[in-house]
């Protein structure tokens, strides 16, 4: 079932900004936009400032949209650090809002963690939170107002903001925690104002996501000319840099762009330019800017300039992670278009290469890459041998419209109704990322993970699996207080859902979660059912998982033909 995303034109711009809910200075239909001081252009040249000079133009109660993804991808680090230092030393600006569509950071102190300071930030609307845990901590401690839009919806909301549309209608998120009949995307106790509402249009339910208008942008490129026209030749991807710049510019704000170098006016190839100069108000040049955290200035394989020789198959160590990836590959067909998510699911592409079938299908990443060898870890998406790279917003358009045949996503918790939680668990806010966008429309959804967590140890080999130390954490729980994937909605849409672990495989049917496969060497009662908070339905066609999954040799797996 295709999922549509319908922009609705605003009758009278400017927009009603979310900041209006919290600040008397924000843009509303009845008030004027915030007025920004900005350095003037001289003879058309874009002002070039230090990062410290640039952030002085950010006023109290402004709404900052930050570009970037994990591992330092497109992160304007100098601007972020300068803003953090300005607040530490001057206690200004105060009470700003943060919009961050993609999770940037290193799951520790980088990303937007430096600006996660009480008093500096009043509210945040993010697609993903966990890459910058300091901002998550402010939300967990009820020190800021905190919202989560699905990553794809959020980037499309920014596009709507650029077009002065007050919101978007979408089926994405129905039945999940962003549905206002549940939590409405609110992440803590102090966040009360609704940004998402339920709408019935011609007999169908949609979620209406209010547009939140940004008025300050931190973006990054590789090179710009003296008028601000920018190219991304050393970058991993584009993300939604253009959408962010357009949204801030059209809402009367100020766009700050960090680059590695500047060149003479009109010397950049026009097809390489991704940001037109008239959108840029300030340029900050950082000659030491690197493509990713802690690496060389640029890796030409990651930037797509060089092709890695992948003719030699690299063997992956046999462990529980590989077992899950191998079994997940069985759900792929020739010619399929898939998405792979971060976590244990990201081993799919590596296993396919080992089996020699990686060219029989196309894997995509929501941030824009299409094809290639998927990277793992904090810089997920920094692929090599990529076939194409789209703007992130366009990638999500494709996903929302039902373009995916299959997706591979990791899970944190699953309940007896097939619902999945990844956004908030163990008291920590991780955020949804693109999970809701992807799982809402993919024709087949394959969730990947271990049956338990927290110290799980296994021995894999000779065609079987042995549990040597059971995990302390139960992942298959009776019920979920918050839902990131709705089993009920998936069944209503006719989607095919699998849950693959190292020792068992489940599928979702109308009467609940069915156990359909169990690993050789595993006892159903002792190792599976007793480790779940509910009893799964033992399928009448219960099978043993293919012993080849648990051997060190290449399986010789051949993909079945697509429909």
Predicted regions and their residues:
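Glycine-rich adenosyl-nucleotide cofactor-binding module
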Residues: 302-328
